[in-house]
């Protein structure tokens, strides 16, 4: 279920503050965040945001196609290591 239209999109205030500071600065740096739940706004386009996946911060370069999605959608939290090998196949 999607978010109510009357509520509008959500983004953490501390992330918005960091984005505004970054756009005012001449030199672009990576913005570190733990806020996977924040919606990507058009003002984020062109910035690199390092999103926490539970182990490390993974850098995500924001493009126009990402606007409206959540930051956490672009950083998987689980590592798939493969299924167990079949013992019958080895014999």
Curated annotation (Swiss-Prot):
<dbReference type="GO" id="GO:0005737">
    <property type="term" value="C:cytoplasm"/>
</dbReference>
<protein>
    <recommendedName>
        <fullName>Small ribosomal subunit protein uS19</fullName>
    </recommendedName>
</protein>
<dbReference type="InterPro" id="IPR020934">
    <property type="entry name" value="Ribosomal_uS19_CS"/>
</dbReference>
<dbReference type="GO" id="GO:0019843">
    <property type="term" value="F:rRNA binding"/>
</dbReference>
<keyword id="KW-0687">Ribonucleoprotein</keyword>
<dbReference type="InterPro" id="IPR005732">
    <property type="entry name" value="Ribosomal_uS19_bac-type"/>
</dbReference>
<comment type="function">
    <text>Protein S19 forms a complex with S13 that binds strongly to the 16S ribosomal RNA.</text>
</comment>
<keyword id="KW-0689">Ribosomal protein</keyword>
<dbReference type="GO" id="GO:0015935">
    <property type="term" value="C:small ribosomal subunit"/>
</dbReference>
<dbReference type="Pfam" id="PF00203">
    <property type="entry name" value="Ribosomal_S19"/>
</dbReference>
<dbReference type="InterPro" id="IPR023575">
    <property type="entry name" value="Ribosomal_uS19_SF"/>
</dbReference>
<keyword id="KW-0699">rRNA-binding</keyword>
<dbReference type="GO" id="GO:0003735">
    <property type="term" value="F:structural constituent of ribosome"/>
</dbReference>
<dbReference type="GO" id="GO:0006412">
    <property type="term" value="P:translation"/>
</dbReference>
<comment type="similarity">
    <text>Belongs to the universal ribosomal protein uS19 family.</text>
</comment>
<dbReference type="GO" id="GO:0000028">
    <property type="term" value="P:ribosomal small subunit assembly"/>
</dbReference>
<dbReference type="InterPro" id="IPR002222">
    <property type="entry name" value="Ribosomal_uS19"/>
</dbReference>
<keyword id="KW-0694">RNA-binding</keyword>
């Amino acid at each position: 279920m999607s978010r109510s239209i009357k509520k509008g999109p959500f983004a953490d205030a501390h992330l918005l503050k960091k984005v505004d500071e970054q756009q005012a600065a001449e030199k672009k740096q990576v913005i570190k965040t733990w806020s996977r739940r924040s919606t990507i706004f058009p003002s984020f386009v062109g910035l690199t945001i390092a999103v926490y996946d539970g182990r490390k911060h993974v850098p995500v370069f924001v493009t126009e196609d990402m606007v409206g999605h959540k930051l956490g959608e672009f950083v998987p939290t689980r590592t798939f290591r493969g299924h167990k090998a079949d013992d019958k196949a080895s014999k």
